[in-house]
Amino acid sequence: MNVKQPTDDELRFIAAEYHLDLSDDDLASFQGLITGSLAAYERLHELTEPKPEVKYPRTPGYRPEPADNPLNAWYYRTSIKGAASGPLAGKTVVIKDNVCVAGVPMMNGTSALEGYVPDTDATVVTRILDAGGEIVGKAECESLCFSGGSHTNENGPIRNPYNPAHTTGGSSAGSAALVAAGEVDMAIGGDQGGSIRIPSCWCGTYGLKPTHGLVPYTGAFPIEITIDHLGPITATTADCALLLEVIAGKDGLDPRQYDVKTEAYTQALSGDISDLRIGIVEEGFGWANSEADVDASVRAAADQFAALGATVGAVSIPMHLDGQAIWTGIATEGATMLMVKGNSMGHGYVNGDRIP
């Protein structure tokens, strides 16, 4: 039997922990209930787990030599060609190494996972291939994606293509670096607290953290379900909208997705923006660790929207000042439950091999 029937002594021990005193009749009653439940669990154990089809042939690829990987941005290189036609036909795409690509090694920046090879594709991977894109490899990321720098990866720091002595930002460090260097057209990144946006800013690419739940996270290594996001990193806004159009929408598998509404994002790239209102958060500027020229650059970029006809104005969100503290609590507690106790599988996960 997959799960063994508890003994009466074990039931008494559990009951005592809850300050319950069970009679022999109580124990017999509970044992009867448990027997019926265990039969159901035994049947569940016998059922074959359905797995999404791996639709496109591929090889595991290879780990590039340092001479061919000067930014240390590639984890693995491969070539997985998708459909013969589609909106991404002719586009090369690299996938952040916290996202599963069947048959291709994945370590999520840490030696703890080195040697792991997924046997299914993440939903975003399947959608990219169905749209005609070619996946050309996995991009290095920070250790378990828990850094906004580019220095915690087990294989060494990921270097900025504009100045190798500078950080790329993280945790989607390799994704942004490879796009900025022109080695790929597009990348998939992940974002829990800036991990698409930070490296995109520091590498001069376009990165978008989509609305929560818009893009399915199915098949990606999580941190906490309320802050997990996958999104595009590209060299142009047009490609950013195009990739988002391909990967957005429900997949019926991701509990992060609820009332998902997709749009034709590429059609929103031109036209009148006079009805667009943009708020500049006052509390986002002037921090002790802020740089004045960066603050000025952000405000200048906002002014460009005003010049194009949008309404741009200051807004105050005082709680923004506590955002990092709030995020730290959510991410730490969530990661403990989901990544550590849940083995990245979810709350209440139990490894069947450990059940006596």
Regions found by a protein language model. Give the residues of each.
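Amidase signature
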Residues: 1-88, 246-356
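Generic structural signal for helix capping and beta-alpha/helix-loop junctions
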Residues: 143-145, 195-196, 288, 322
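Fold-level recognition of mixed alpha/beta catalytic cores in primary-metabolism enzymes, strongest
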Residues: 39, 43, 149, 155-157, ...
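Gly/Ser-rich catalytic/binding loops embedded in alpha/beta enzyme cores
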Residues: 21-192, 303
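Short, basic, helix/turn surface patches
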Residues: 159-173, 213-220, 336-351
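Amphipathic alpha-helical segments in well-structured domains
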Residues: 121, 205, 295-299
